[in-house]
């Protein structure tokens, strides 16, 4: 068993994990987000749904961030090589290419990582174990096996860019959504979690 899976197997919540911000600096412990509702997505700047999903992520963070939502984006190049920029190039790609028009994410973006295979970030290994399939499409799989570039391949692998994981204020993953489920349509589920009470830091 690889180290990422060992760490994931021992974890009880996302608070056991950390990730380095895209802008650089020290790793951010997800434990610092205790009490917040988290929406975690693997993102890519050259995907067919980049404009839709990035703008919807911004919209959810803008509207629901003050009430306790934190959106987290993890660039990943494992799906069709659609995040082939270097870490330091991603923000400019978003600003000038796609979505373009001066777009700037208002949510946390982290350094590129893998979400599947032996090199998967421990956070994603944990999320995949906790939520083995998207709730809206339990049969979601990679549509073209020729595009699989990682090993081992597991049934709970993320199938493409912009899969979403909703995590409650206790750090426990609650629901997984496929790439086809629009980010903005998660709002009712987020609202339900936020209405359960104020977030506590």
Curated annotation (Swiss-Prot):
The keyword Oxidoreductase applies. It is found in: Cytoplasm; Mitochondrion. The gene is GPX1. GO terms for molecular function: glutathione peroxidase activity; phospholipid-hydroperoxide glutathione peroxidase activity. Gene3D superfamilies: Glutaredoxin (3.40.30.10). This is Glutathione peroxidase 1. The modification N6-succinyllysine is found at residues 86, 112, 146. Signal peptide: none annotated. GO terms for biological process: arachidonate metabolic process; glutathione metabolic process; hydrogen peroxide catabolic process; lipoxygenase pathway; response to hydrogen peroxide; response to selenium ion. During periods of oxidative stress, Sec-47 may react with a superoxide radical, irreversibly lose hydroselenide and be converted to dehydroalanine.
């Amino acid at each position: 068993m690889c180290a990422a899976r060992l760490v994931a197997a021992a974890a009880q919540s996302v608070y056991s994990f950390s990730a380095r911000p895209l802008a650089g600096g020290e790793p951010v412990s997800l434990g610092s987000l205790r009490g917040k509702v988290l929406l975690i997505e693997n993102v890519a700047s050259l995907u067919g749904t980049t404009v839709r999903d990035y703008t919807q992520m911004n919209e959810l963070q803008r509207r629901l961030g003050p009430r306790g939502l934190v959106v987290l984006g993890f660039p990943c190049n494992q799906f069709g090589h659609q995040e082939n920029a270097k870490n330091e190039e991603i923000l400019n790609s978003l600003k000038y290419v796609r979505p373009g028009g001066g777009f700037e994410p208002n949510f946390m973006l982290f350094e590129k990582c893998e979400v599947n295979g032996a090199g998967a970030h421990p956070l994603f290994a944990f999320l995949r174990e906790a939520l083995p399939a998207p709730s809206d499409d339990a049969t979601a799989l990679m549509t073209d096996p020729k595009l699989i570039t990682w090993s081992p391949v597991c049934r709970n692998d993320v199938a493409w860019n912009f899969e979403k994981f909703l995590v409650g204020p206790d750090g426990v993953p609650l629901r997984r959504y496929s790439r086809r489920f629009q980010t903005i349509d998660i709002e009712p589920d987020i609202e339900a979690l936020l209405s359960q009470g104020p977030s506590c830091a």
